[in-house]
Amino acid sequence: MISVNDFKTGLTISVDNGIWKVIDFQHVKPGKGSAFVRSKLRNLRTGAIQEKTFRAGEKVEQAMIENRRMQYLYADGDNHVFMDNETFDQTELSADYLKDELKYLKANMEVQIQSYEGETIGVELPKTVELEVTETEPGIKGDTATGATKSATVETGYTLNVPLFVNEGDVLVINTSDGSYISRA
């Protein structure tokens, strides 16, 4: 058990028959009445976000999440196959389950598979990935307006905005948390 006064961003807790990750929290001490903790939680099974208020000092159960380093191998129809780097066991996850992560997954990529009591509840990608541009309009010499962008499609099929100087075949560093262009590799 952990006190809500000890909340930290990224902490996983078990509340209301769900596994939740603390996204944001705020200790509130009103002039009248007792203090409380207002928190924003993400359900790790469904991805739903919920705001919940706890009384100060209230105890909640901390969920022990197991992280395993795995390597993405290949897509098999609607399923995606990952291999545990230590035991070489293979795990299949459906495309519905992966959702946003599919934009960045490529063969041999290392990811963290999160599980709770034997049930897989999440895939954590590296903070950045390097992907090759497969399709974009050519950059025109002299086209140097400040902050101008164009769209580019990378090898996974994901489309993002990039600066005008990026060409087909370039390898880009992409932020996986918001899908934005960082630099050329």
From Swiss-Prot:
Coiled coil: none
Pathway listed: Protein biosynthesis; polypeptide chain elongation
Alphabetically ordered keywords of this record: Cytoplasm, Elongation factor, Protein biosynthesis
GO cellular component: cytoplasm
Subcellular location: Cytoplasm
Gene Ontology biological process terms in this record: peptide biosynthetic process
InterPro entries: Elong-fact-P_C (IPR015365), NA-bd_OB-fold (IPR012340), Rib_uL2_dom2 (IPR014722), Transl_elong_fac_P/YeiP (IPR020599), Transl_elong_KOW-like (IPR013185), Transl_elong_P/YeiP_cen (IPR001059), Transl_elong_P/YeiP_CS (IPR013852), Transl_elongation_fac_P (IPR011768)
The keyword Protein biosynthesis appears for this protein: yes
Biological function: Involved in peptide bond synthesis. Stimulates efficient translation and peptide-bond synthesis on native or reconstituted 70S ribosomes in vitro. Probably functions indirectly by altering the affinity of the ribosome for aminoacyl-tRNA, thus increasing their reactivity as acceptors for peptidyl transferase.
Pfam families: EFP, EFP_N, Elong-fact-P_C
Protein name: Elongation factor P
Record gene name: efp
UniProt superkingdom: Bacteria
Classification via PANTHER family: ELONGATION FACTOR P, ELONGATION FACTOR P (EF-P) FAMILY PROTEIN
Alphabetized GO MF terms: translation elongation factor activity
Annotated family: Belongs to the elongation factor P family.
Predominant cellular place of this UniProt entry's protein: cytoplasm
